[in-house]
Curated annotation (Swiss-Prot):
Subcellular location: Cytoplasm
Name this protein carries in UniProt: Probable transcriptional regulatory protein Dshi_2762
Keyword Signal appears in the UniProt entry: no
Cellular component, GO annotation: cytosol
Protein keywords: Cytoplasm, DNA-binding, Transcription, Transcription regulation
Length: 246
């Protein structure tokens, strides 16, 4: 996805892995609890929970943490979370979508608005930038899963819409409503995926220079550091030369 995979690489290079990992475990656990509470606590009978557990496993979340997150949903234990989407613009006019799960809407809205303002952006109304994205299913495989032709054939058979392959691996795209079915079919052909999730895929991007990217990263990192925030997506584009300097 434009912006998102590059952003993950930047975060890795910046040495934020340990801090991000702890936050990632917390965010994935929250998604499991919410998914289980909204539907059946059995992943086989609850597509959203199945995807949440699958994503947690792919990110090396321990089995006991996953089981605890599911148990938390039973018997009314744990907080009730609202799912909210915020939309706005970052430095350079980059469109930003923030997905949050919160037990206090006022707190989260205030924090997100403040984070945008302090980092050269501004929070907009719902719908102000989402028209520049499509909701899609995304399944990622490492390069060793197969060559581009093999993965393309498996993706077509599975009902996917698009495949992007390079030396780092394969990203398979499908309709958001088909993700569970497509990922299951891909597993039968290619084995376990690295990641399976619903994402916002930009349909248009904004090119940034080094200074613009540095400013944008401050905003994206600050948003990601908010415990209520689950996912942040931005439609930036930058040259390899700029990316190498971050």
């Amino acid at each position: 996805m434009a912006g998102h995979s590059k952003w993950a690489n930047i975060q890795h290079r910046k040495g934020r892995q340990d801090k991000l990992r702890a936050k990632l475990f917390s965010k994935l656990s929250k998604e499991i609890t919410v998914a289980a509470k909204m539907g059946d606590p059995d992943p086989d009978k609850n597509p959203r929970l199945r995807l949440a557990v699958k994503e947690a496993k792919s990110q090396s979340v321990p089995k006991d943490v996953i089981e605890r997150a599911i148990k938390k949903s039973l018997g009314g234990e744990g907080e009730n979370y609202d799912e909210i989407r915020y939309e706005g613009y970052g430095p350079g006019g980059v469109a930003v979508i923030v997905e949050a799960m919160t037990d206090n809407r006022n707190r989260t809205a205030s924090t997100v608005r403040s984070t945008f303002s302090k980092n050269g952006g501004n929070l907009g109304e719902t719908g102000s930038v989402s028209f520049m994205f499509e909701r899609k299913g995304q399944v990622s495989y490492p390069a060793e899963a197969g060559d581009a032709d093999t993965v393309m054939m498996a993706a077509i058979e599975a009902g996917a819409e698009d495949v992007e392959s390079d030396e780092s691996g394969h990203i398979i795209w499908c309709a958001d409503t088909d993700l569970n079915e497509v990922s299951t079919a891909l597993e039968a052909e290619l084995g376990e995926s690295e990641s399976t999730k619903l994402v916002w895929r930009p349909t248009t991007t904004t090119e940034l220079d080094l200074e613009g990217m540095q400013k944008l990263m401050k905003l994206l990192d600050a948003l990601e550091d908010d415990d209520d925030v689950q996912n942040v997506t931005a439609n930036f584009e930058a040259s390899d030369e700029v990316m190498a300097q971050l």
